[in-house]
Amino acid sequence: MKNKAGFVALIGKPNAGKSTLLNTLLNAHLALVSHKANATRKLMKCIVPFKDKEGYESQIIFLDTPGLHHQEKLLNQCMLSQALKAMGDAELCVFLASVHDDLKGYEEFLSLCQKPHILALSKIDMATHKQVLQKLQEYQQYNSQFLALVPLSAKKSQNLNALLECISKHLIPSAWLFEKDLMSDEKMRDIYKEIIRESLFDFLSDEIPYESDVVIDKFIEEERIDKVYARIIVEKESQKKIVIGKNGVNIKRIGTSARLKMQEVGEKKVFLNLQVIAQKSWSKEEKSLQKLGYTHQRNRD
């Protein structure tokens, strides 16, 4: 059997549809999806097997990254570092651009990325045929920069095989790096954490989801049930009250939604205990961010 394997960084502006694309390719709910921008904060490996036209069995290890953006906030700098690290670690990059985006995001990507890359135009189901053709034509001015230009829709599963075929074509023959049926090397507790964060984005408005994080203090994995004890961290007491809601209505909704998603992913019952605490300025202090697993690379003179 002929095998290929390789790491592919999935890069794009916030809300380009990176996590939706990966969940569709995996046919599973692993990556955090939200209509709000900048929901993804940390790097996640997602493993997609694919048999290409040349008969190679390819193991494509996608590196799902936070949206490519620049902000002064320390947390956002940590997120940008994750994307830059993924580009450095990968053999190949895929830049995902929404059909509604201008070209500035791609131009920024070109200034940062030294690796060969594929340009994928996402959300084509949300535009007319004329609009898609016009956007493809606009990107053609950069045709010397990318390996291929692939229009697709993750939501409608359009042209996804074309993307995988193109990726596989540019991977080198190699033994597989992970077990055959593995979808991610993430621990279940980390996947559960992201599911709780996703529920925060689903049920809370304004800045609260961006000024919150989740810590799983205790995780007990049993044969028939997983027991999860987690804290939702916010920055202000006023935010804590909103997360809990009157008579606990908000935290109940968040908890129920998260638990049902956990049970679907883990394929077993889940007991979920959620607490809410206020920790002033946690997203602005480097020590607090390090404790939560966020790091960033400082510029060197």
Curated annotation (Swiss-Prot):
One of its GO terms (molecular function) is small ribosomal subunit rRNA binding. Residues 12-19 are annotated as: G1. Residues 204-280 form the KH type-2 domain. One of its GO terms (biological process) is ribosomal small subunit assembly. It is a peripheral membrane protein. Pfam families: KH_2, MMR_HSR1. InterPro entries: G_ERA_dom, GTP-bd, GTPase_Era-like, KH_dom-like_a/b, KH_dom_type_2, KH_sf_prok-type, P-loop_NTPase, Small_GTP-bd. Its main location: cytoplasm. Residues 64-67 are annotated as: G3. Residues 122-125 are annotated as: G4. Residues 4-173 form the Era-type G domain. Residues 38-42 are annotated as: G2. GO terms for cellular component: cytosol; plasma membrane. It comes from the Bacteria. Keywords: Cell inner membrane, Cell membrane, Cytoplasm, GTP-binding, Membrane, Nucleotide-binding, Ribosome biogenesis, RNA-binding, rRNA-binding. Monomer. Belongs to the TRAFAC class TrmE-Era-EngA-EngB-Septin-like GTPase superfamily. Era GTPase family. An essential GTPase that binds both GDP and GTP, with rapid nucleotide exchange. Plays a role in 16S rRNA processing and 30S ribosomal subunit biogenesis and possibly also in cell cycle regulation and energy metabolism. HAMAP family: GTPase_Era (MF_00367). This is GTPase Era. The gene is era.
